[in-house]
């Protein structure tokens, strides 16, 4: 059973497996897509959980030990956590938020990787997030997939970088028009 095209084109698989393994939940690990509607990572997780008869858990964590961490950013993330909790609750989805703090820093994703039948996360192709995702993928028994929810033309679909905005605009005109007319 394949994902619908509009979701499949946004996926970058970090393993050869593309279906959940075992009976554990499908975990959606949110790192940067803090919205409850039109969130392709959550949509992929919901679709996989539903079609493979697995529970769904949406996980969101915050730890201050990363480059350029700031109070302003953390306030925005924690405000988003409140909105996510309310929004996912209205949709009947299980959402958990973990705030790491001194004296309480369990390796939540390591633990979830051992329980999950599959991990879905938002594609954020910058360090240290790329390293974190690779580390979790190496621990996980089931498949791990990154889903682009930031771009109209998904990064896995276009797949290359350009040095000028007009070059990208011209190269993706047809793809952009197709997606906007869906």
Where in this protein do the model-derived segments appear?
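Active-site "lid/cap" and pocket-lining segments within catalytic core domains
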Residues: 1-182
